[in-house]
């Protein structure tokens, strides 16, 4: 008998196919077929909450298709699992296409662009009843020469698929294997909560492979080895927000084979009391964060970690209008440019 995780991966396969070879009418019909009419759809800023599959098509996908008429979606991770009675499918990959017309006022390039995504779908009774998804919109801004915020401490590049090339899991679900991966990542996350006791108390080298890669969002960047993770992300992050706290009531953490996925909306609250992260000043402002993650385990260690954070939402909570700053930076490339300052 086919397991529920495999059934759920099969359920979204037609949607994945419709997003690979996109026909707008077929996509609309497929969204209507697989999503419940009252599905809770939560997307990255500036989209935020979307009112069902029709709104998802008209307000989100149609403008993106207008900007990139040859749009396609490529998965490199597809996994599934359950948290209590909540059954999830998690997908990671990137949208790509020729950027022909402006999108969210990001000026077009006429060239191929890519945008990472992490998308999680909760399934009940054969329908998607909830979607939590982050699209790396700052990555598109960067490719258009239009990102107006501080440069990344990590490296900006095309984040790769898993080194093992096995991220689209189709084998029969193995609960023991999934639980072993889940236990490793859970222990690592517990270790991170001891950061105030000192670096050694987190036991990073116990959990992470010596050649680990951490693939952060555009605006933070990617890094290799524990030392790179510490220098280019963790130390600035913890210095700026030492009180960061997970929100277990929102947490969905599940395993499938060597992979573990995490989604929460939001997953963390913090207070920005220190300097050094994203070039932001210590404004003593409370924030929530949306971070959607995937990990790949290898021989008892974590070898790769894909991370997307809704940085545009962080800036929005701080009263920073990234899109307006982008329009100022690119006003001569905006469609309504008149020669006058904005």
Descriptions of predicted regions:
Residues 1-342:
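C-terminal and inter-domain tail/linker signature
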């Amino acid at each position: 008998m086919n397991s529920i995780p495999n059934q759920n991966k099969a359920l979204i396969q037609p949607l994945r196919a419709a997003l690979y070879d996109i026909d707008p009418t077929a996509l609309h019909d497929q969204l209507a077929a697989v999503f419940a009419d009252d599905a809770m759809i939560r997307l990255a800023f500036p989209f935020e909450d979307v009112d069902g599959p029709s709104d998802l098509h008209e307000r989100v996908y149609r403008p993106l298709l207008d900007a990139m008429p040859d749009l396609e979606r490529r998965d490199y991770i597809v996994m599934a699992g359950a948290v209590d009675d909540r059954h999830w499918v998690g997908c990671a990959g990137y949208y790509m296409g020729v950027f022909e017309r402006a999108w969210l006022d990001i000026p077009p390039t006429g060239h191929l662009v890519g945008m990472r995504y992490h998308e999680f779908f909760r399934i009940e009774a054969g329908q998607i009843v909830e979607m939590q998804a982050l699209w790396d919109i700052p990555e598109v801004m960067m490719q258009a020469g239009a990102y107006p915020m501080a440069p990344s401490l990590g490296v900006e590049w095309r984040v790769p698929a898993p080194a093992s090339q096995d991220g689209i899991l189709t084998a029969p679900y193995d609960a023991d294997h999934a639980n072993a991966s889940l236990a490793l990542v859970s222990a690592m996350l517990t270790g991170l909560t001891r950061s105030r006791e000192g670096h050694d108390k987190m036991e990073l080298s116990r959990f992470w492979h010596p050649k680990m890669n951490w693939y952060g969002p555009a605006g933070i960047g990617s890094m290799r080895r524990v030392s790179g993770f510490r220098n280019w992300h963790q130390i600035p992050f913890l210095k700026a927000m030492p009180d960061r706290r997970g929100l277990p009531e929102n947490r969905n953490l599940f395993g499938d084979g060597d992979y573990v996925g995490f989604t929460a909306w939001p997953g963390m609250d913090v207070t920005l009391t220190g300097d050094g992260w994203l070039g932001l000043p210590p404004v003593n402002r409370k924030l929530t964060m949306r971070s959607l993650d995937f990990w790949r385990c290898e021989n008892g260690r974590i070898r790769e970690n894909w991370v997307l954070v809704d940085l545009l939402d962080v800036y929005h909570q701080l009263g920073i209008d990234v899109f307006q700053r982008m329009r100022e930076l690119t006003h001569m490339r905006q469609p309504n440019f008149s020669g006058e300052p904005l």
